[in-house]
Amino acid sequence: MTRSFADRHIGPDAAELSRILEVVGVDSLDALAAAALPASILDDAGAGPLAALPPAVSEHEALAELAALAQSNTVTTSMIGLGYYDTLTPPVLVRNLLENPAWYTAYTPYQPEISQGRLEALLNFQTMVSDLTGMEVANASMLDEATAAAEAMTLLRRAGRSRSNRLLIDADLFPQTRTVLHTRAEPLGIEIVEADLAAAGLPEGGFFGVIVQVPGASGRVVDWTALIAAAHERGALVAAGADLLAMTLIVPPGEQGADVCFGTTQRFGVPMGFGGPHAGYLAVRSAHARQLPGRLVGVSKDADGNPAYRLALQTREQHIRREKATSNICTAQVLLAIVAAMYACYHGADGLRAIARRVHGHAARIAGALGEALVHDTYFDTVLARVPGHAEAVVAKAAACGITLRLVDPDHVAVACDEATTDAHVEAVLDAFGVAPAEPVDAGIATRTSEFLTHPAFTRYRTETAMLRYLRSLSDKDIALDRSMIPLGSCTMKLNATAEMEPITWPGFAKLHPYAPVEHAPGLLKLIGDLESWLAEITGYDAVSLQPNAGSQGEYAGLLAIRRYHLDRGDTHRDTCLIPSSAHGTNAASAAMAGLRVEVVKCRENGDVDLDDLRAKITDHAERLACIMITYPSTHGVYEHEIAELCALVHDAGGQVYVDGANLNALVGLARPGRFGGDVSHLNLHKTFCIPHGGGGPGVGPVAVRAHLAQYLPGDPLESGSHAVSAARYGSASILPITWAYIRMMGAEGLRKATLTAIASANYLARRLDEYFPVLYTGENGMVAHECILDLRELTKRTGVTVDDVAKRLADYGFHAPTMSFPVAGTLMVEPTESENLAELDEFVAAMIAIRAEIDQVGAGVWPAEDNPLRGAPHTAECLVGEWTHPYSREIAVYPRGLGHARAKVWPAVRRIDGAYGDRNLVCSCPPLEAYAE
């Protein structure tokens, strides 16, 4: 029998599924759906919500269709610039990092002991950024340059002394950056003033911050030292956008006095990809480190005193501070940040300088030939030419040679050089302008003299052999899906199939500039159109935008749509967002960013939203009610049977219903939020639809809406007032083929079966583990959704063993831990997904049962509460060969199920890490080698 793609994506075969359903207590998947989901929202299994999807095809057929789409695109030599440049990705990084499941299937490193490899790689990224910008602390990536600028704006406001609501931005910022800044500023009451700051200086009046860019959109390089000093004298802080390649030659903003730097690392080996994904960055002075949004890797020490990496200052994050968080950013761009970091490690400081000099040299040749047509005589890679009335003709002549220039206006053309620019390209550009070659023009820029990238990480791995082994040594320290299931609740760590991943590096997708003429991208635009219609069909909504490049940004875009809808109707008073106490912290943070007040709705003891409290809150805020944000199924892992009534209550009060799509893997093919009461949802393509998590990004968070909100979806970032939320119109377009391939190969029947299998597997684990770790919440008929919460609180009270102990001990058993203490402290949330077979589920069950037996040993006094296999976990190979004073044996420590157990052994790189020490002694760049010798 020929196996379909769905048969290979879904872990349990027919016999295993029969066993799973037997334990769950139902005789079929349809019976499971009827028992678990409310009948009021369940779609008919025959017609189903997926009937309009195309029938499933094989992997080879899907790849052939994708190849045809890619080949229909026109790949030219892009010299458009504006923050997107062609780059030469070293093949060693393509094969061993970008295309390696040991890297792209990992999750965010919340379990640092089994994440030391990518944490070290991210520390390299932070060091690279802080060195090149001249700043002191950088975070572990942002979503793109424009959103990084927006985060810089709010950081300036939080960290500064000024009480003004005015922000000054230089008119030479990238246009997409200006648009996103305006989108973010308006709901927060920030007034943006644009001016040519280089020419006019600072205007009169108060302002809390200034944002400039080096080089500017026109290519102009300005020394901002005097303006920064003047801004500081007036109580304002300054953020500067900085091109990292340019910073190898130009005095960086940090040395000019800037307080914050932001930008993108795209040109460090990451293809343009029609807009993304790329790792943005944000760097600050040490005084502002605790104001940084996103994730920050720091150096701490483990139980044996060895240096160890971890995520630092996590109390800043939205999971804890909710609407008071520094940002709503959760998933960022870890995989792409690591590519950029390894690009810097591979080339080193001298290699990057050489690339920068070559790029600048090509620009200087063009500038010299342009003569008096050159607009700015200070530049790095981009020159602006004044050609009155002839701009379109110049661009057309270059296009005939396969080169795409930037048409600025009828009188001006910009030309951006990059790593891939050749002498032949320069000659073709000069021919398009109708000018003869001439001597290069001195760009007149202040040359950098300070050193950078001096840490051995940037000098040791300059040969392919060294880099290959370095990447392997790092990935060996981590647990990703290539080694084990990752049962993280609310994260949906399912298979990222090779056939889905293969097209992302094809030139027809990877080498397109996001602002290229639309006629260059018919294949990708067809793919995007397919996805928009398929996702609308799956969710029951009427329109979809793929622009948001993370779930957090999809949330934000959806809430902005609701806000603008109310404002257009004259309901300016509707500014209150109701959020259940069980909600993901991102919800509250997104609401605050959208200018909404957050009011928390209580949950009942069974985990459901308390409708009585909801009615009371609606009454209390009737005139001000904007919306409710509800996750469905809930973050408590159950299908709330009163969801339709909840939606009706809010609608009757004039509010909108935002259904968080984080748990859509429990709905696809069964129920549609747009049909059971939702007005808007965001989806997570990196959860439900197979884009890999990449160790913390990339993600894609499309926003789907009913027809009345469609006009409020984000628009083209090159158009002012478009309410764009990302730098590129289609966000992280180059990874959309992954989701397209998944839906195309699964078909309607496969998608529905995947959902039901995920639900069946979660209920199987709940049934098997309930007597050892009580399942905290169940819905009607005792069912859970696609995840379940295991309650350890009574065990902790009785024995002192915590969820942290259990999470660390699971590493000794070869597993990544489930989600800890969310949404309820002292619990573990488990989500197996549809991709794990019965053998893997049973291995996890056996590990958890064995851990329960160890907990009982502690409770019985056999092992002391402070010295037992759980409190000592995880155990490294190094600790085995040292002095052993523990009351349990070495074998129990590292082979808890016996030496003969067949499961591959995972050796954590470090012992348990001291988080508090790392936060008290914050170090966020590569430590000196002496730290490892102490």
From Swiss-Prot:
Superkingdom of this protein's organism: Bacteria
GO annotations of cellular component type: cytosol; glycine cleavage complex
Modification sites for N6-(pyridoxal phosphate)lysine: K687
Assigned EC number: 1.4.4.2
Family annotation (Pfam families): GcvP2_C, GDC-P
Extent of the signal sequence: none
Keywords for this protein: Oxidoreductase, Pyridoxal phosphate
Record's catalysed reaction(s): N(6)-[(R)-lipoyl]-L-lysyl-[glycine-cleavage complex H protein] + glycine + H(+) = N(6)-[(R)-S(8)-aminomethyldihydrolipoyl]-L-lysyl-[glycine-cleavage complex H protein] + CO2
Molecular functions (GO terms): glycine binding; glycine dehydrogenase (decarboxylating) activity; pyridoxal phosphate binding
Keyword Transit peptide in annotation: no
First-level EC class: oxidoreductase
BP GO annotations: glycine decarboxylation via glycine cleavage system
Statement: the UniProt record of this protein carries the keyword Transmembrane: no
Cofactor: pyridoxal 5'-phosphate
Role description: The glycine cleavage system catalyzes the degradation of glycine. The P protein binds the alpha-amino group of glycine through its pyridoxal phosphate cofactor; CO(2) is released and the remaining methylamine moiety is then transferred to the lipoamide cofactor of the H protein.
Family: Belongs to the GcvP family.
UniProt subunit comment: The glycine cleavage system is composed of four proteins: P, T, L and H.
Name of the protein in question: Glycine dehydrogenase (decarboxylating)
Gene: gcvP
